[in-house]
């Protein structure tokens, strides 16, 4: 009886150790999986290194091309010219359910205006990643075609643009027409200034390329009076006297 109890106690100890080891292994696996899971969530990059097991040159080329992705910015045209929703806007434009179409048209109007918002003279679709208001006001204060444009006109344009893009209020037909009028006026002023500046540059280049007419050369001869002809410099007289003395000395020898 005692031997059987000792055997059962030994079995219990073994079972306890086995179950304890199993629980410890399961807890270790669970904790490890949770740590790896949170580590993957916090990582911004891919779970597998880019270019894994690739040659060094190929891996560098992949990294260079991936670094250029963040500089790629594109904003497509919201409403195509043949969009069927434009017909609905023309027939039922006064209804408030179509206000989102006026917002889309307002953003596309920047593209259609062809105003050189960039100082380099390019015609961007829009100013992505920039504050349109501060950028346009900066152009107004610099030596660009925007210099001196009325602040009220720019404020009207920018208020309409920001309301159409970011605002939560009503942007219907009347707001769009007011915005379009300000945009057309600004485009007219800027294009007129660009045209006058180009004409000035062309006229200046034309003046530089034209060779001046050759005027006939005149030769002016000044005759000295006889009293001034006899006047010679003092050093010339001294040189002549030295030459005469030298000739006299040479003849005596």
UniProtKB/Swiss-Prot annotation:
A GO CC annotation given for this chain: Golgi apparatus
Keyword match Transmembrane: yes
Main location group: membrane
Keyword tags: Golgi apparatus, Membrane, Mitochondrion, Transmembrane, Transmembrane helix
Ranges annotated as spanning the membrane: 11-31
Keyword RNA-binding: no
Record InterPro entries: C1orf43
UniProt-annotated location(s): Membrane; Golgi apparatus; Mitochondrion
Membrane protein topology class: Single-pass membrane protein
Its biological purpose: General regulator of phagocytosis. Required to uptake Gram negative bacterium by macrophages.
Domain notes: N-terminal region is required for phagocytosis of Gram negative bacterium.
Protein's name according to its UniProt entry: Protein C1orf43 homolog
Organism listed in the record: Mus musculus
Lineage: Eukaryota, Metazoa, Chordata, Craniata, Vertebrata
């Amino acid at each position: 009886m005692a031997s059987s109890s000792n055997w059962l106690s030994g079995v219990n100890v073994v079972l306890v150790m086995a179950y304890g080891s199993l629980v410890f292994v399961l807890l270790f696996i669970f904790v490890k999986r949770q740590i790896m899971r949170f580590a993957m969530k916090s990582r911004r990059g891919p779970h597998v290194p880019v270019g894994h097991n690739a040659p060094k040159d190929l891996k560098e080329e992949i990294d260079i091309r991936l670094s250029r992705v963040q500089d790629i910015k594109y904003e497509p045209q919201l409403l195509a010219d043949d969009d069927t929703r434009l017909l609905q806007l023309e027939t039922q434009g006064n209804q408030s359910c179509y206000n989102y179409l006026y917002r889309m048209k307002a953003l596309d109007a920047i593209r259609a205006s062809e105003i050189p918002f960039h100082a380099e003279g390019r015609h961007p679709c829009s100013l992505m990643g920039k504050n349109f208001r501060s950028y346009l006001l900066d152009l107004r204060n610099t030596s660009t075609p925007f210099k001196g444009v009325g602040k009220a006109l720019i404020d009207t344009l920018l208020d309409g643009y920001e309301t159409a893009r970011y605002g939560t209020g009503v942007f219907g037909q009347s707001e769009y027409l007011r915005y379009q009028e300000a945009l057309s006026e600004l485009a007219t002023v800027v294009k007129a200034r660009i045209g006058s500046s180009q004409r000035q540059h062309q006229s200046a280049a034309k003046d530089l390329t034209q060779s001046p007419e050759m005027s006939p050369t005149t030769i002016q001869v000044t005759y000295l009076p006889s009293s001034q002809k006899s006047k010679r410099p003092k050093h010339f007289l001294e040189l002549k006297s030295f030459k005469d003395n030298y000739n006299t000395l040479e003849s005596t020898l």
